[in-house]
């Protein structure tokens, strides 16, 4: 019987940065569908809206999306800015060249979005951003790697970090394993979706990681379906 007391340290298939082809395209399409149906996108959108509303005089935003995948969430976040009568420029980062090409095509109609092929853990960022966002991305790292990345992001984030990631729980694990086994056409999704849950974090683990990285001001909220929404302020409480 699988236990969930500790994070699974197994690598996901998609952690191979050289993987490419139709299987990856199918994986990205299905992930977008899963996030839309299970409300995953709304977690990031709601967090960004909270940050934007807390700065009513600011009308232009620079936003980075780490591990951006298809880029779909940047399109959704841009709608939030427009609803708040703001403008924005988005930079998506992914270390897989094939995924970068996919995202560039997916976001081609939005001139405010650019996609860069970059390893965010090891490569320098080109600029400072108002908001740095990461959805379903940070569970790919070990706790030590994540601390290093968060320390690095302190210097790159002017206002807030927004994190949307998985809560490690048996119900979430077996539910997504059953759903993807039944409906998914992607061997990547069938393997990686449940493993992602097993690699997710408990709330207490997030607190430990943030404290190790030197963050004092943050809000962590559990959100359906088995996600944590984090809004982190690197330099102040707002």
Residue ranges and their predicted role:
Residues 1-30:
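N-terminal, positively charged/glycine-rich alpha-helical extensions of SAM-dependent methyltransferases
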Residues 21-47, 51-52:
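Class I SAM-dependent methyltransferase Rossmann-like catalytic core
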Residues 64, 70-72, 77-122:
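Class I SAM-dependent methyltransferase SAM/SAH-binding core
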Residues 133:
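A conserved beta-strand element that flanks and buttresses the S-adenosyl-L-methionine
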Residues 141-152:
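A short, conserved alpha-helix within the catalytic core of class I
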Residues 158-166:
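Conserved beta-strand signature within the Rossmann-like core of class I S-adenosyl-L-methionine
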Residues 166-213, 219:
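C-terminal alpha-helical "lid/dimerization" subdomain adjacent to the S-adenosyl-L-methionine
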Residues 219-238:
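Core SAM-dependent methyltransferase catalytic element
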């Amino acid at each position: 019987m699988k236990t969930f007391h500790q994070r699974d340290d197994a690598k996901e298939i998609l952690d191979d940065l050289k993987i490419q082809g139709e299987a990856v395209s199918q994986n990205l399409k299905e992930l977008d569908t899963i996030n839309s149906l299970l409300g995953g996108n709304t977690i990031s959108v709601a967090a960004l809206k909270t940050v934007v509303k807390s700065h009513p005089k600011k009308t232009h935003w620079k936003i980075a999306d780490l591990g951006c995948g298809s880029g779909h969430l940047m399109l959704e976040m841009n709608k939030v800015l427009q609803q708040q009568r703001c403008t924005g420029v988005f930079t998506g980062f992914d270390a897989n060249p094939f995924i970068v090409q996919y995202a560039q095509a997916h976001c081609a109609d939005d001139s405010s979005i650019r996609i860069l092929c970059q390893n965010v853990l090891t490569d320098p960022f080109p600029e400072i951003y108002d908001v740095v966002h990461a959805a379903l991305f940070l569970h790919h790292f070990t706790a030590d790697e994540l601390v290093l990345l968060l320390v690095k992001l302190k210097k790159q984030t002017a206002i807030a970090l927004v994190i949307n990631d998985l809560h490690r729980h048996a119900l979430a694990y077996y539910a997504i394993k059953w759903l993807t086994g039944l409906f998914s056409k992607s061997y990547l999704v069938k393997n990686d979706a449940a493993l992602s849950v097993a690699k997710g974090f408990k709330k207490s683990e997030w607190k430990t990681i943030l404290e190790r990285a030197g963050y004092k001001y943050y809000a962590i909220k559990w959100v359906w379906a088995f996600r944590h929404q984090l809004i982190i302020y690197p330099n102040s409480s707002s």
